Amino acid sequence: MESSTNRRYLWIFFGLLLGVMAISYIVNTMNTPQPAKPGDFDDQAGTAYVTVRDTEGNLILQTGLPVTVNDEYISAEDIHYIVIRVDGDKALARRKTQTNAQAGISSDSLPAVTLHYPNNLILRTAGKKLAIYHTHNDESYILTSGKSAEPPDGDILKVGDAMAEALRRNGFTVVHKKNNHNPHDINAYSRSRRTSVQALKDTPEAIFDIHRDSAPLSAYMTTINGVETAQVMIVIGRSNPNMNANLEFARQIKATADKIYPGLMRGIYMGRGDYNQDLYPRALLFEIGTAEGSLTIASHGARYLSDVITAVLGQD
């Protein structure tokens, strides 16, 4: 009888122990942060955007990029801002410094260029290689395709084609990678990293990841030589050991563009992440136009940008 009673107590003990363990597991699961869904950190998949204003309420930027505290932005006017607060689709930035992107760049050293070709530049591009790819292959332009994304291959690949063609015409050897990195989610940059590593085996002068932004059309529109053109924004990853080298290269491009094609550059955005720029000191991400625009105006922007790149790298 005593043995039977002991066994009963033993079973009750183990039953209670299992119950406590089950409850503990459920509570721990509920309180453990869950992995973010791809869409939580996705950028530019649609037409949503963040509006950034300065401390006086002036509009300084609208972008589909993820905007986080401590991100920095050098505006078209070379005003350097730092983001101090983000609240949903609104952000606040304070002025950090007034920069001078053109410091040290003599106007005498810059070529006079015309549409799509720097005809007065003594080119030293022969034998120089460049690489182009697209992390977000599906990005498109609504005025051309009726939608902001067209998987697997959107209008953005044709923007890359226009840029590659212009650079080749200017004397560069260009590899335009069209590897598919879909879907447009948080892992797209991990997939495109393999493409970047592959392209870098040829040791190019620079490598460019070509995108389009999400913002109102007016935020990316300009006119150059009487031609409606999409503006270009350079994006730098600030979680990146090559950030200083990447930023210096970006400043060279912006300063040169400001001289030969005023209004082309929208600015330089330094966001959280690395955008695979840790792989190379001359790795840049270009936002060419916005989803609300068209392939035509984006292609104009890409060709003008190619002239600027030629002016910078053609004089090395």
Predicted segments with their positions:
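Active-site-adjacent mobile loop/cap segments within catalytic or ligand-binding domains
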Residues: 267-316
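Soluble non-cytosolic domains of exported or imported proteins
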Residues: 67, 150-158, 186-190, 240-248, ...
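A short, glycine/acidic-enriched catalytic loop
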Residues: 216-242, 250
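Catalytic-core regions of hydrolytic enzymes
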Residues: 142-222
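Solvent-exposed loop/turn segments at secondary-structure junctions
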Residues: 137-140, 180-184, 212-217, 239-242, ...
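Active-site-adjacent substrate-binding region
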Residues: 242-268
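Non-catalytic propeptide/linker segments at domain boundaries
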Residues: 63, 77-135, 140-143
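Long terminal accessory regions outside catalytic cores
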Residues: 1-100
